[in-house]
Each structure stands twice: as structure tokens, then as C-alpha cells.
Amino acid sequence: MQWTTPSYTDLRFGFEITMYIANR
């Protein structure tokens, strides 16, 4: 799965940060 959509990348990045903070 390789999406080059900036919005998708931003969403995925934000999701990763959210999960990181939630797993702290």
C-alpha cells in the first residue's frame, strides 16, 4: 500500500502520533 496523497500521509502521520501518545 503506497499512497502518494499528501492528505493520506498527513492522516497516517497524525494517527501514528495519536497511537504513540495513547500507548505511553
From Swiss-Prot:
Superkingdom assignment: Bacteria
Pfam families: PqqA (PF08042)
InterPro entries xrefs: PQQ_synth_PqqA (IPR011725)
Cross-link (Pyrroloquinoline quinone (Glu-Tyr)): E16-Y20
A GO BP entry: pyrroloquinoline quinone biosynthetic process
Pathway it works in: Cofactor biosynthesis; pyrroloquinoline quinone biosynthesis
Ranges in a coiled coil: none
Transmembrane segments: none
Sorted UniProt keywords: PQQ biosynthesis
Family: Belongs to the PqqA family.
Function: Required for coenzyme pyrroloquinoline quinone (PQQ) biosynthesis. PQQ is probably formed by cross-linking a specific glutamate to a specific tyrosine residue and excising these residues from the peptide.
Name of the protein in question: Coenzyme PQQ synthesis protein A
Gene name of the record: pqqA
